[in-house]
Curated annotation (Swiss-Prot):
Record-stated family: Belongs to the UPF0434 family.
Designated name of the protein: UPF0434 protein RPC_0266
Coiled coil start-end: none
Cellular-component GO terms for this entry: cytosol
Pfam families in the cross-refs: Trm112p
Disulfide bonding pattern of the chain: none
């Protein structure tokens, strides 16, 4: 199975993966921030980093939002 370039945002993260990921704390939706390479959870006020195209969904690795 191949993934076309149109299925990938700038970081190389598969768009389908982003569609199914949820915040591990709130189980709510995540927003992709392409500029910062983060997945934002508004409910938990956390930003999960994306490193080398891999979302790091560990709360202890997340950045707290103001």
């Amino acid at each position: 199975m191949t993934t076309s370039a149109s299925d990938r945002p700038e970081a190389g993260v598969d768009r389908k993966l982003l569609d199914i990921l949820v915040c591990p704390i709130t189980k709510g939706p995540l927003e992709f921030d392409a500029a910062r390479q983060e997945l934002i959870s508004r409910g938990a006020k956390l930003a999960y980093p994306i490193r080398d195209g891999i979302p790091i969904m560990l709360p202890e690795e997340a950045r707290k939002l103001g």
